[in-house]
Amino acid sequence: MAIDALFVARGVSLGYGESPVLRDVDLEVREGQYWGWIGPNGSGKSTLLRGFLGLLRPLAGTLEVAPRLTDRARVGYVPQRSELSDALPTTVRELVELGLVRSAVPHSERAAALRWALERTGLTGMERRDVWSLSGGQRQRALVARALVRRPELLVLDEPTEGLDVATQDALLETLGALHREARLTLIVVTHRLEIARERADHVALFLDGRVIAGPRDVVLDSEAARNAFRGPGLALP
């Protein structure tokens, strides 16, 4: 395992019970990379993510995780759907502070970590706003801030643009791009939207029929398998 590798899958099959959802996966995520994991619903994106996060054991092959990432505090995760109840009156500050629970951030540095997370997500000055008074895009940025306040080495986002209008999607993706460039944060964006990977990521994992084609963006998207998969209205590759 290379010194800058965070996750390495070699010949991995993953699934539930004895039925594999993914077969013979080879994929390596390294520090500072921006990954787009693309595929339709049910293609295995979340299954592989669960494997990397230690929530699912492989049926075959080897799955290695950098020792420092076995401490969950080093991984920030933004789920596809917020688990918050709309009956819970939570301010932006209270929501973001939830990310500090069981984190490795020293108590003496938590105020600075909170300010940094709010600043990076464009939420400075909104700390006292009720989460449910925010727009969809602002609420999604608050969830990103909750993950960032832990000072993670890796940020994983599951369908972060789902349900947002185009302008709000673009603003959120610009925020993520700035985090990748300026904070050198490693990103994995799980999505079914081809354009996110094509325009934003530098590495792509394409989930097709139980297999994964993974590597540098242009190599993967120029492959015959990718071109066959994305033929059709609005999906054609350049």
What are these model-predicted stretches?
Residues E109-M126:
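Conserved ABC ATPase "signature" region
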Residues R151:
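Conserved catalytic motifs of ABC-family nucleotide-binding domains
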Residues V204-P216:
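H-loop (His-switch) and adjacent beta-strand-loop-beta switch element
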